[in-house]
Amino acid sequence: MATLLRSLALFKRNKDKPPITSGSGGAIRGIKHIIIVPIPGDSSITTRSRLLDRLVRLIGNPDVSGPKLTGALIGILSLFVESPGQLIQRITDDPDVSIRLLEVVQSDQSQSGLTFASRGTNMEDEADQYFSHDDPISSDQSRFGWFENKEISDIEVQDPEGFNMILGTILAQIWVLLAKAVTAPDTAADSELRRWIKYTQQRRVVGEFRLERKWLDVVRNRIAEDLSLRRFMVALILDIKRTPGNKPRIAEMICDIDTYIVEAGLASFILTIKFGIETMYPALGLHEFAGELSTLESLMNLYQQMGETAPYMVILENSIQNKFSAGSYPLLWSYAMGVGVELENSMGGLNFGRSYFDPAYFRLGQEMVRRSAGKVSSTLASELGITAEDARLVSEIAMHTTEDKISRAVGPRQAQVSFLHGDQSENELPRLGGKEDRRVKQSRGEARESYRETGPSRASDARAAHLPTGTPPDTDTAPESSQDPQDSRRSADALLRLQAMAGISEEQGSDTDTPTVHNDRNLLD
């Protein structure tokens, strides 16, 4: 049996191991297409700001082709470094594209104010054609859908600090798009707006340079459909992380945005580890979880073997991402989601509409959290040096805290209450029919007389005698009644008092034509 278990563990490890690269065959290269990336040909701030202005206009032009749009975005993304050309050549290793760099310098003879650097060749016409300044109609289209503030005509500046603020504002809006461009583009607008508000409050961006929605939609769609652009952005993030010492302010902002980008599309895997394993509830000892726990262990080892690109496997369209989907461990994932819903309020908005979702194990996770509330782990307590007295104190405090949390989040348990609408009277309500209606009225009258003559204790017995013998007990209240008869008697007495009071109010109001009606809308207001 021990040999079988060792073979099983070895089989699981080899099954999820990535293929080993061998030197027998050459690298597979695809059919490449050329991407032209304009970069500044000098260190002048005027050149960079003018190039940034032209590229933003170019991206806003709806007639721009896909490769040209990718080249413009790569040019903007690399503008914050001192040598954009060296950066692009160092980090670019894409089998699908061939990047050609074009140095751009200032020119007074071109309509765009820029020209391509060349040795004795006039390139103003080519520069105007690239930046779409050869046609006035195209120029007007490029201006449409630019910044939300229509008073901004251009973003050409000569101050390095001002240029960095404008460039950082534009780059922040582009980088935020990468977080959900692949995984959830339909719901990305809300999260992108929250990031924008955050960086505006931190004074990292300038609110006046908020780009228009359709400009951002164009960039988001291009990021979603172009793998080469995403490869460049991920390579740039990793290159910034490897940089030692202090980084430029824009680079630090990119690293901050990376916290929203990293592990995109891996929520099922990460949350299963967080809520299913790290919580260490005893439910992990179930036999049903044994195989899936072994699968998760193999996936965690595989994640580490992939190295620094593992958190970006979904963004990079790595085929190995399918192994990390929740379909590989459905029971443990369903259990972890139940734990997460009880522990964190933010988990309540997750979509569990999967074909492999198991409601039974989801409820198991919820019950484990509810019944384990206030309990202290003996293993962790011994490691931290927590005494038994301290553990009891912590359990007592945690129980009260959990009760307060439940009361605030869910509210008190209430019976179902029906209200009358303002346009209805008692006569207009649906009746039970002849015999049933008379039986109910007779029961109410006898209950009122019994309450007046014998008091609450005998009235409850009288009401019990009038109950139908074939009525099944309420599943929610039957266990409580069997456990505590005194509480059941008090509840019955309270119900009889309410019915008696209702009967008295009916007799007092019989002389009036219009009965008092309670409207649920008025109560809610």
UniProtKB/Swiss-Prot annotation:
Localisation: Virion; Host cytoplasm; Host nucleus
UniProt KW Phosphoprotein keyword: yes
Region (Interaction with the phosphoprotein): 477-505
Domain of life assignment: Viruses
UniProt: RNA binding residues: K180, R195, Q202, Y260, N351
Region Ntail, annotated ranges: 404-525
CC per GO annotation: helical viral capsid; host cell cytoplasm; host cell nucleus; ribonucleoprotein complex; viral nucleocapsid
GO molecular function: RNA binding; structural molecule activity
Composition skew (Basic and acidic residues), residue ranges: 433-452
Post-translational modification, as annotated: Phosphorylation at Thr-279 is required for the formation of the nucleocapsid.
InterPro entries linked: Paramyx_ncap
Annotated motif Nuclear export signal, positions: 425-440
Chain positions found as Phosphothreonine: T279
Region annotation (RNA packaging and organization of the helical nucleocapsid) ranges: 1-375
Region (Disordered): 418-525
Domain notes: Ncore is globular and carries regions required for N self-assembly and RNA-binding. Ntail is an intrinsically disordered monomeric domain in the C-terminus.
Main function: Forms the helical nucleocapsid (NC) in a ratio of 1 N per 6 ribonucleotides, protecting the genome from nucleases. The nucleocapsid (NC) has a helical structure with either 12.35 or 11.64 N per turn, approximately 20 nm in diameter, with a hollow central cavity approximately 5 nm in diameter. The encapsidated genomic RNA serves as template for transcription and replication; encapsidation by N is coupled to RNA synthesis. Forms the encapsidation complex with the phosphoprotein protein P. Before encapsidation, the newly synthesized free N protein, so-called N0, is chaperoned by P.
Assembly notes: Homomultimer; forms the nucleocapsid. Binds to viral genomic RNA. N0 interacts (via Ncore) with the phosphoprotein (via N-terminus); this interaction allows P to chaperon N0 to avoid N polymerization and non-specific RNA binding before encapsidation. Interacts (via the Ntail) as N-RNA template with the phosphoprotein (via C-terminus XD); this interaction maintains the P/L complex anchored to the nucleocapsid template during the sequential transcription.
Family: Belongs to the paramyxoviruses nucleocapsid family.
Name by which UniProt lists this protein: Nucleoprotein
